[in-house]
């Protein structure tokens, strides 16, 4: 049911050219949630579709009071659609669902139960255990999930499953990272921020209409994105830890080679055709100083970022929160 007051659940559905899927999807959502005693809404984000998707949504909105829809002027891709959907969401919980009918809305009640299990979780990610896709999608996906699990430190089988359930504070934490294709790493981002993440096997259906937007470059792009988000999240506040360590290793390696060349020259009076090795030593020392300088500059930028007032997310609180501080007028300082 929909409501004008507080909303329990918002379902964000990004879509691109899915006009044939929308009516059966709305029927499935209604059947799955209408008897759950929840106030809910579904926010469809049309990512610049060139078919009649938005017109179908406009027609369906007359039958489903919980339906809301927004449309981009052109295609900005899934991360932008999710970001807009998260900003539009009014629920205390936020679910995501793909519009191609491969995700089953009937799984959302199961995600709600899993979110409250074992003392409560903050994010429950679906796992397409029996995936209804060709090998050209499943094999690269398995490799991607294995590498992402190893790098991120959180063991999940299916980072890219479109069916997920978030508490609102996780959504707000994730918004700054919703660009490019980084939406695939939202469970890892939540885990790094200290939120409790769980996984739940969900039903996966074959695609009924249209064609997949999956491309062969997604595996390579995903691995590059993984390196990017790992640096941004883990070293945003301490870039010197990364660049300083690499710079120190490079400088030490160059210094060791330089010491060897110096000792050789001291003992024999010549470096014995070790000129390439000497050039390598000089290069390593220069690169080491450059990396160290990059880390120092990064620390200065991180300090400015921290002064902007952003603090790590709070999990629990005892007692009232402090009232926001207001700076006195300049003439009273």
Pin down the residues of each PLM region:
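Membrane-embedded alpha-helices of multi-pass transport/permease systems
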Residues: 8, 19, 26, 105-108, ...
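Residue-level detector of anion-binding/catalytic polar loops
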Residues: 39, 121, 196, 203, ...
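Membrane-embedded multi-pass helical conduit in multi-pass membrane proteins
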Residues: 236-331
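Short Gly/charged-rich anion-binding patches and loops
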Residues: 52, 185, 279
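Structured catalytic core of nucleotide-sugar glycosyltransferases
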Residues: 1-142, 147, 166-171, 192, ...
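Conserved catalytic loops of nucleotide-sugar-dependent glycosyltransferases that act on lipid-linked
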Residues: 77-89, 102, 106, 130-258, ...
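Histidine kinase transmitter module recognition
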Residues: 14, 32, 36, 45, ...
